[in-house]
C-alpha cells in the first residue's frame, strides 16, 4: 500500500495518520516481521561473536553480558514499538517518531545517527561476505593471487545486483525463508565442527589476554558489541510493514525474536568459544576443521545470507531515496530500474570502498554499537518513552528511565573511545586495503 498523508481507521475508533512513502506498508504478518528481526540476530555476524564478545569478556562476563543484553534490548525495543502510533500518527521512520516528540533538531540528529548506524552495519556485511568468499577461495586455491579487497569488491557487486532486483522490504517474501535456511546451514556446520574440534582438542586457555589497560579497553569495546548483537536501529521501519493492530503484532514479533530467535545465536557463540578458547577467530569458520565441501558450503551460505541481511538494513536508505524522487509504480519499469541502478548502486559502491579500505570487522561492530546503537536503542528509546508517557509514569518509573539514559550515555562515550583506540591500533598494524 503506497500511502500519502491519509487517515486510516484501525478498527478501534481511532483515526491514524500515515505519512507518505514510496514503499509498501501495513501488508505483512507479525510472523514475517519476526523473521526479519530473527534474520538480523542470526546473520553471518553470529560467526564473529565468539571472538569479539566471548574472548574479551571470558566465560562469566560473556554469558552474563549476553543474557543481560538480551533482556535490556527486549525492554528498549518494546518501548519504541509501543510509541508507533503515539499522538494519532503512524511513525514509520525512526526520525519521524523522534521529530514528533522533540521537534526538528531531534528529527535531523536521529536521521544522522540512524543512517550512520545502518551504513556501518552494511559495511560490516560486505566485509563478512568478502571474508567468507576469500575463505572459499583459500580452501581450494591458496596462492594469494587474490586479496581480501578483491573479494570485498565482488561481494559488493553481488549486493548491488540483489538491491536492484528487490524493490522494498516487504518484497523480500520468500527470501526470508531462504535466509533462514542459509543461517541454519552455517550455524549447524559451525556448531558440529566446533564440537568435533573441542572434543579432540587439549585443554584450552580462556584467560582474557593483555595488560590491565588493554583489557579495560577491549572489555568496554565488547560491551558495545553486546548491544550491537540484538538491535537493528530500524525498528519503526520494520514495524511499518506490519498489519494492524500494529503494536500488538510487533510485540509478538519481538517476543519471538528474543526467545526462539536468539537460541541459534547463543548456541554457536558459546560452543565456538568452548572449542577454541582465547584463540577463537573473529570469523569462527576460520577455526573449524572438517571436509572442504562442508566448510565451503557454510561459507557460501554466509555470503548469500549477508547479501539478504544487507538489503534489510539498507532498506530505510532505499525508502528515503525512492520517496524523495517519487519512484513508484511498477518496479520493473525502465525508469525505476535505472534509478535503482544509480542510487542503490552508488550507495553500495561507497560502502564497498570503505569496507575494503578498513576491513576491521570487530572494530566496526564496537564502533557501531558505541556511536549509534547505544544512542538510538537505549538512550533515545528510554527518554522518548519518558517524555511521551510522562503523565502515566510513577516516580520510580521516571527515575528508572533517567538512570537508563545517564548510564547508557556514559557507556556510549566510553565504548566510542575504546572502539576508536582499537581502530587506531589496527590501522598501525595493517595498511589500508589490508589482506586480513
From Swiss-Prot:
Q: Where are the transmembrane segments?
A: 29-49, 52-72, 118-138, 151-171, 172-192, 216-236, 254-274, 296-316, 345-365, 366-386, 405-425
Give the Pfam families listed for this entry. Aa_trans (PF01490)
Name the organs or tissues of expression.
Answer: Expressed in epidermal cells of leaves, sepals and petals.
User: InterPro entries from the entry?
Assistant: AA_transpt_TM
Q: What is the predominant subcellular site recorded for this chain?
A: membrane
> Some GO term, biological process aspect, for this entry: which one?
proline transport
Q: Which compartment or compartments is the protein found in? A: Cell membrane
One of the record's GO molecular function terms = L-proline transmembrane transporter activity
Q: Which domain of life is it from?
A: Eukaryota
Task: Quote the cellular component terms of the Gene Ontology held in the record.
Answer: plasma membrane
Recorded topology in the membrane: Multi-pass membrane protein
Keywords assigned: Amino-acid transport, Cell membrane, Membrane, Transmembrane, Transmembrane helix, Transport
Q: Which phenotype arises from disrupting this gene?
A: No visible phenotype under normal growth conditions.
Q: What does this protein do?
A: Proline transporter that mediates proline and glycine betaine transport. When expressed in a heterologous system (yeast), imports L-proline, glycine betaine and GABA across the plasma membrane.
Q: Which family does it belong to?
A: Belongs to the amino acid/polyamine transporter 2 family. Amino acid/auxin permease (AAAP) (TC 2.A.18.3) subfamily.
Indicate what this protein is called per its UniProt record. Proline transporter 3
Q: What is the lineage of its organism?
A: Eukaryota, Viridiplantae, Streptophyta, Embryophyta, Tracheophyta
Amino acid at each position: 500500500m503506497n500511502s500519502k498523508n491519509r487517515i486510516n481507521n484501525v478498527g478501534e475508533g481511532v483515526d491514524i495518520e500515515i505519512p507518505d512513502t514510496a514503499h509498501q506498508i501495513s501488508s505483512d504478518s507479525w510472523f514475517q516481521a519476526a523473521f526479519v528481526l530473527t534474520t538480523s540476530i542470526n546473520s553471518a555476524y553470529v560467526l564473529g561473536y565468539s571472538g569479539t564478545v566471548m574472548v574479551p569478556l571470558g566465560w562469566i562476563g560473556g554469558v552474563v553480558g549476553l543474557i543481560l543484553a538480551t533482556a535490556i534490548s527486549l525492554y528498549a525495543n518494546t518501548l519504541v514499538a509501543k510509541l508507533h502510533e503515539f499522538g494519532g500518527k503512524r511513525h514509520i521512520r525512526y526520525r519521524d517518531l523522534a521529530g514528533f516528540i522533540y521537534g526538528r533538531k531531534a528529527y535531523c540528529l536521529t536521521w544522522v545517527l540512524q543512517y550512520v548506524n545502518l551504513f556501518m552495519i552494511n559495511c560490516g556485511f560486505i566485509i563478512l561476505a568478502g571474508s567468507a568468499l576469500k575463505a572459499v577461495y583459500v580452501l581450494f586455491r591458496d596462492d594469494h593471487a587474490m586479496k581480501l579487497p578483491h573479494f570485498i569488491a565482488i561481494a559488493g557487486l553481488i549486493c548491488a545486483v540483489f538491491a536492484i532486483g528487490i524493490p522494498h522490504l516487504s518484497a523480500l517474501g520468500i527470501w526470508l525463508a531462504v535466509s533462514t535456511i542459509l543461517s541454519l546451514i552455517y550455524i549447524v556446520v559451525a556448531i558440529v565442527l566446533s564440537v568435533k574440534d573441542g572434543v579432540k582438542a587439549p585443554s584450552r586457555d580462556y584467560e582474557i589476554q593483555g595488560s590491565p589497560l588493554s583489557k579495560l579497553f577491549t572489555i568496554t569495546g565488547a560491551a558495545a558489541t553486546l548491544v550491537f548483537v540484538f538491535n537493528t536501529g530500524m525498528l519503526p521501519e520494520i514495524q511499518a510493514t506490519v498489519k494492524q493492530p500494529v503494536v500488538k503484532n510487533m510485540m509478538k514479533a519481538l517476543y519471538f525474536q528474543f526467545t526462539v530467535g536468539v537460541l541459534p545465536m547463543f548456541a554457536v557463540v558459546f560452543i565456538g568459544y568452548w572449542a577454541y578458547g582465547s584463540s577463537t577467530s573473529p570469523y569462527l569458520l576460520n577455526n573449524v576443521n572438517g571436509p572442504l565441501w562442508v566448510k565451503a558450503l557454510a561459507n557460501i551460505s554466509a555470503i548469500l545470507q549477508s547479501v539478504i541481511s544487507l538489503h534489510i538494513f539498507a532498506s530505510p536508505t532505499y525508502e528515503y531515496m525512492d520517496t524523495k524522487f517519487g519512484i513508484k509504480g511498477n518496479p520493473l519499469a525502465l525508469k525505476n530500474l535505472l534509478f535503482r541502478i544509480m542510487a542503490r548502486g552508488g550507495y553500495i559502491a561507497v560502502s564497498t570502498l570503505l569496507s575494503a579500505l578498513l576491513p576491521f570487522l570487530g572494530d566496526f561492530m564496537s564502533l557501531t554499537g558505541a556511536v549509534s546503537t547505544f544512542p538510538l536503542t537505549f538512550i533515545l528509546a528510554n527518554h522518548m518513552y519518558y517524555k511521551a508517557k510522562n503523565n502515566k509514569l510513577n516516580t520510580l518509573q521516571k527515575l528508572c528511565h533517567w538512570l537508563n539514559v545517564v548510564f547508557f550515555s556514559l557507556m556510549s562515550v566510553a565504548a566510542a573511545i575504546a572502539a576508536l583506540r582499537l581502530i587506531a591500533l589496527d590501522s598501525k598494524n595493517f595498511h589500508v586495503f589490508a589482506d586480513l
